[in-house]
């Protein structure tokens, strides 16, 4: 294969991460400019239907999560009569915030009651919002106050197993990054100086790259990484002649073989890069705000849908609420029920649609929150937000982004997915807690086991009305990768008067943004259809 500038930059990105590659590209004048794509959604205006379309038009929305409530909110702006049917007793669906008073019985029959102190909580579901997501636009429109979310913190730890002396050792992100970037910069600079890139880069290019690498890796004058203040201090600099004592770097071979840099690219991601945001008081604040705008008289909580059928008058939905069987017929229906659960309803959907719904496979994910009566992560580890990462089943430990310097706080003791979450799924809450504490203490020490006031956990595969964290499309590896599966495309089409919406029908699966954009798309299609049929 020809060795080109493009292949060189691609390899640089694979080994050093997007930050290293992009920095080098900028230095060489190769980095492209970026521009946000134009938004095409046009919100419906108040009175869009009045005096323009004959008669009234009604929509029944199945599900009071992000897609369902957003659909109802936008449709009401134009004068549609909307009824939302939600099986739970709260809005938000998989956007679920556990706080004092929360109670949940899972599919195993175990009931948990949350006893966190007033003002303390954690988000069992969605917890962060990227700057690019329209979720922030709705926070603005609905008056939901937001605050910064610590998605990355140089003081949190990485702890991985390997065949090196770093195996099972907790290393701060700042130290891991300083050593990894330092040694990589040293090796790349050496390769550049020895002529390995002569067929790719001009003399001026190499000079610019060497200058960049010297700065990026904090290299010595002779191009070596000898350590850096970037990795932290054993004793902090102070007054007078107290210059501090820098932490010594790990050996190059240990750093490379240990894989301590395996998670650095996480916050390079378009939807994970700082700044990130979250609502003050919990993510569910957004959906209580939607509820207030829509009106509780237009939302039926505790409504378990049993049937959804196209009929001559539109769509008839049957459900149970308060121990009684009820039904509603509307001109249109928007179904936001998780796709793998729709087939359980009595329905008259075509076979190919039912097959398409089954192609959206459920996934495993869960969290456990521990309330500590002492914020040891701040006072002892100097950690204010962010997450420690590990290859243990707990995957990561997320620290509070609020109530700084107070006397207590809720730590998310694990946020795991896939096979790692399956290790927790069949356990009782007490067993989950014990496992989380045992693994967490191997990262943060014995203090992790003390001063525990209460705890609460959630596993989405075991949660009624969800039975999944998010959808993975069969044959697509869980994401579309620029091309949709036939089953996915099938569900983008209405079945007579029934429309489907949700994050599973977006290119932002598992994000609120995905559900909200899907809802907007369906609202637009319904409104255009009503106008055309008038």
Curated annotation (Swiss-Prot):
The keyword RNA-binding does not apply. Binds 1 FAD per subunit. It is found in: Cytoplasm. GO terms for biological process: amino acid catabolic process. It catalyses: an L-alpha-amino acid + O2 + H2O = a 2-oxocarboxylate + H2O2 + NH4(+); L-asparagine + O2 + H2O = 2-oxosuccinamate + H2O2 + NH4(+); L-methionine + O2 + H2O = 4-methylsulfanyl-2-oxobutanoate + H2O2 + NH4(+); L-phenylalanine + O2 + H2O = 3-phenylpyruvate + H2O2 + NH4(+). Belongs to the flavin monoamine oxidase family. FIG1 subfamily. Catalyzes an oxidative deamination of basic, hydrophobic and aromatic L-amino acids, thus producing hydrogen peroxide that may contribute to the diverse toxic effects of this enzyme. Is active on most L-amino acid (39 on 43 tested) with the exception of L-Thr, L-Pro, and L-Gly. Homodimer; non-covalently linked. This is L-amino acid oxidase. The lineage of its organism: Bacteria, Bacillati, Actinomycetota, Actinomycetes, Mycobacteriales.
């Amino acid at each position: 294969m020809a060795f080109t500038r493009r292949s060189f930059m691609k390899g640089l990105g694979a080994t050093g991460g997007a930050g290293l590659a992009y920095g080098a590209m900028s230095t060489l004048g190769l980095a492209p400019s970026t521009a946000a794509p134009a938004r095409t959604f046009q919100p419906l205006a108040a009175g869009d239907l009045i005096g323009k379309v004959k008669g009234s038009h009604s929509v029944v929305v199945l599900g009071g999560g992000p897609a369902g409530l957003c659909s109802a909110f936008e449709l009401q702006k134009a004068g549609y009569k909307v009824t939302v049917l939600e099986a739970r007793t709260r809005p938000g669906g998989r956007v679920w915030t556990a706080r004092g008073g929360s109670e949940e019985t899972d599919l195993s029959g175990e009931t948990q009651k949350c006893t966190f102190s007033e003002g303390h909580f954690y988000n069992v579901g969605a917890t962060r919002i990227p700057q690019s997501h329209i979720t922030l636009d709705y926070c603005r429109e609905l008056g939901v106050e937001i605050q910064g979310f610590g998605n990355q913190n140089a003081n949190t730890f990485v702890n991985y197993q390997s065949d090196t002396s770093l195996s099972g050792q907790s290393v701060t992100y700042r130290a891991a990054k300083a050593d990894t970037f330092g040694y990589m910069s040293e090796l790349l600079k050496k390769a550049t100086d020895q002529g390995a890139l002569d067929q790719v880069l001009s003399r001026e290019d190499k000079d610019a790259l060497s200058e960049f690498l010297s700065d990026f890796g904090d290299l010595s004058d002779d191009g070596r990484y000898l350590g850096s203040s970037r990795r932290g201090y054993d004793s902090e600099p102070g007054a007078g002649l107290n210059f501090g004592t820098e932490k010594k770097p790990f050996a190059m071979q240990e750093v490379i073989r240990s894989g301590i840099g395996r998670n650095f690219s996480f916050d390079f991601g378009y939807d994970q890069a700082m700044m990130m945001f979250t609502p003050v008081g919990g993510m569910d604040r957004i959906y209580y705000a939607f509820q207030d705008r829509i009106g509780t008289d237009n939302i039926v909580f505790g409504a378990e849908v049993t049937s959804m059928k196209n009929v001559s008058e539109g769509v008839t939905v049957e459900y149970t609420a308060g121990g009684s069987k009820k039904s509603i017929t509307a001109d249109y229906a928007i179904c936001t029920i998780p796709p793998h659960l729709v087939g359980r309803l009595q329905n008259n959907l075509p076979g190919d649609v039912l097959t398409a719904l089954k192609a959206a496979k459920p996934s495993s994910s869960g969290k456990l929150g521990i309330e500590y009566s002492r914020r040891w992560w701040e006072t002892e580890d100097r950690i204010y937000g962010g997450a420690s990462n590990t290859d243990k089943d707990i995957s990561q430990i997320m620290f509070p982004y609020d109530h700084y310097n107070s006397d207590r706080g809720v730590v998310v003791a694990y946020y795991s997915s896939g096979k790692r979450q399956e290790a927790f799924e069949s356990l009782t809450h007490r067993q989950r807690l014990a496992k989380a504490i045992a693994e967490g203490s191997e990262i943060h020490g014995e203090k992790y086991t003390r001063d525990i006031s209460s705890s609460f956990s959630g596993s989405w595969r075991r949660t009624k009305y969800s039975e999944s964290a998010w959808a993975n499309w069969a044959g697509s590896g869980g994401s579309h990768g620029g091309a949709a599966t036939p089953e996915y495309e099938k569900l983008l089409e209405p079945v007579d008067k029934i429309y489907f919406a949700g994050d599973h029908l977006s290119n932002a699966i598992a994000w609120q943004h995905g559900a909200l954009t899907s809802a907007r798309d369906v609202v637009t299609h319904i409104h255009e259809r009503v106008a055309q049929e008038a």
